[in-house]
């Protein structure tokens, strides 16, 4: 299998089945981060992931990490915390601040480059990328963002500045997503944090089948309209 060099003059991608086994899922390099190319990528189970100074790299790993929202794992300690939660959770109130928080919360660096931030801000302006914000009073203490594909949500990154803030974002989002027809959350690559919340690995082929079906299923009307999803317990 060869790594494919993308053309700037075409937004077409090779089949994900041609991705490398090592490193797992690396499919192509180059191209750009235009909205049209990014949307084409997500529609085919592909996402960008690269470090500052590297070329744009495109991935479709096998297996794929996913979370069925109804299978979110709510631990006893998290349930106790949430029942007395000090947090307010909103949808699409502060996308720029959320992606900036995701880019800057890791001491060891981040894959969210300036170019990535600008590209996903454009997707947000076009109605394809969305954020969930967690607030304590007026302070943004956590959140997550991703890209919508019908009844499937492609989670990109999350951050937390206070206890259980990112868990709260995902917990509240899962409940709201289910109520409005959401079926599956793409977590891309499994890690210990997402695994602890209920994410599992499935074969890439199965993920692509789910994607093809779910991206044709719309969520309830006006689901992505900015609004408050959860208020702190009194």
Curated annotation (Swiss-Prot):
Query: Per its UniProt record, what Gene3D superfamilies does this chain match?
Result: Leucyl/phenylalanyl-tRNA-protein transferase, C-terminal domain, Leucyl/phenylalanyl-tRNA-protein transferase, N-terminal domain
Q: Which reaction does it catalyse?
A: N-terminal L-lysyl-[protein] + L-leucyl-tRNA(Leu) = N-terminal L-leucyl-L-lysyl-[protein] + tRNA(Leu) + H(+); N-terminal L-arginyl-[protein] + L-leucyl-tRNA(Leu) = N-terminal L-leucyl-L-arginyl-[protein] + tRNA(Leu) + H(+); L-phenylalanyl-tRNA(Phe) + an N-terminal L-alpha-aminoacyl-[protein] = an N-terminal L-phenylalanyl-L-alpha-aminoacyl-[protein] + tRNA(Phe)
Q: Name one GO biological process term.
A: protein catabolic process
Compartments annotated for it: namely: Cytoplasm
SUPFAM superfamilies cross-referenced by the UniProt entry: Acyl-CoA N-acyltransferases (Nat)
Q: Which organism is it from?
A: Salmonella paratyphi B (strain ATCC BAA-1250 / SPB7)
| E.C. designation(s) | 2.3.2.6
Described purpose of this protein according to its UniProt entry: Functions in the N-end rule pathway of protein degradation where it conjugates Leu, Phe and, less efficiently, Met from aminoacyl-tRNAs to the N-termini of proteins containing an N-terminal arginine or lysine.
Q: Which family does the record assign?
A: Belongs to the L/F-transferase family.
Indicate what this protein is called per its UniProt record. Leucyl/phenylalanyl-tRNA--protein transferase
